[in-house]
Amino acid sequence: VYESYTEKNKTRMAISFILTIALLGIPFYGHGASSIVIGILVIAALGLYLAPNIQTKIKEKWRISARTMNTALLCTMMIVIGYSSYALIVIRSTANTPMDQNSPEDIFTLGEYLGREQYGTRPLFYGPAFSSKVALDVKDGYCIPRQSEAGSKFVRKEKTSPDEKDSYIELPGRVEYEYAQNMLFPRMYSSSHAPLYKQWVDIKGYDVPYDQCGEMVMVNMPTQWENIKFFFSYQLNFMYWRYFMWNFAGRQNDIQGSGEIEHGNWITGIPFIDNLLVGNQELLPQDLKNNKGHNVFYCLPLILGLIGLFWQAYHSQRGIQQFWVVFFLFFMTGIAIVLYLNQTPAQPRERDYAYAGSFYAFAIWVGMGVAGIIRMLRDYAKMQELPAAVLASVLCLFVPIQIAGQTWDDHDRSGRFVARDFGQNY
């Protein structure tokens, strides 16, 4: 970073850049000897391309400037700093703390831990439905379940004495079965949750013939439309937009729900809207009406965020460019996670924490909503900039005041010292 920043010597600058990329292992893609060959070829090609005498001979638009190198190295440094936080997992596991799930004490168990291998695999783009049957192959007169390539993995060998050197052994990898019936974008894939899928979607399905060791049986598969309906009704609406509206419209209570109209839904605090959504809230028992998690924002943060969204998108050319940055932050930390997790019904806990980044992104638009209101006051009320800014700030100040007033009781940590005491004792 220093060499590319000072730009005193182009040779040293190129060497430092190549060494950084090489030492991070970026060019060494693959496994075994092939990764070494690929890495050497990539480093050699990069060194040839960045050589000062080559850079002076090629067209200016193809040259790598010191600024580009510096930016690339800074980005790489930020990535390394971010990934270095994973070292805490290994350090903590090595200390053998009471809670040490999967004991990720070496590079192999750390990979399994980060890959969430203890939770199994979930199909994302193509795979089985909850009613799919394992494909069968006939071998020597027997029906054998068809398995995919399992590969292998390395695990640490248990020591027989403290003086024994560390060693690792190779074991067969995870066994994956192949299914005879598959579908695109499978959202209802878990055979353990079949009754729960049917609670969320009225599944009629369609029959598919299946050869079960010479016996032809019919397997009822959900249709693609039923699959999409579950995606929208449960995974998107219940497991994302419900949490989103908790933060920007209002929350019924903090009791975990599974789709009931009295537990954990989003509300607005506006009676006629809430009556349409979840029924008359005045008919709820007192313990639910007085729940500390009952928070109403009257959709004010949501409205302010939408104003900020449209103001940024239509403000100028620079505004639309900034809008796409915030939008992709909002999407990748929200809906993209929904697509990746492919969650089943009856989760053990509310999962709103998984989408906190998406809510932070929308909060950026909430802040920009103030600028949008200032622009509206100037354009439609013909106000001067300073009076418009003062009036918009005063009006919008009621939004965070309402949020704080509603959520203070269910977020008050006064007198709670368990977390601090555990940390101090440890």
Regions found by a protein language model. Name each.
Residues 2-11, 50-63, 315-319, 363-389:
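Membrane-interface junctions at the ends of membrane-embedded or membrane-associated helices
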Residues 6-7, 11, 28-41, 92-96, ...:
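Membrane-interface catalytic loops of GT-C/OST-like multi-pass glycosylation enzymes that act
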Residues 7-18, 67-75, 316-330, 385-391:
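Membrane-interfacial loop-to-transmembrane alpha-helix junctions, especially the N-terminal start
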Residues 18-21, 71-80, 313, 368-404:
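Signature aromatic-anchored transmembrane alpha helix within multi-pass, membrane-resident enzymes
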Residues 75-81, 297-304, 317-340:
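Transmembrane alpha-helix segments characteristic
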Residues 335, 347-372:
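Hydrophobic/aromatic-rich transmembrane helices and adjacent perimembrane loops
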Residues 352, 389-426:
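Membrane-proximal, lumen/periplasm-facing interface regions of secretory-pathway glyco-
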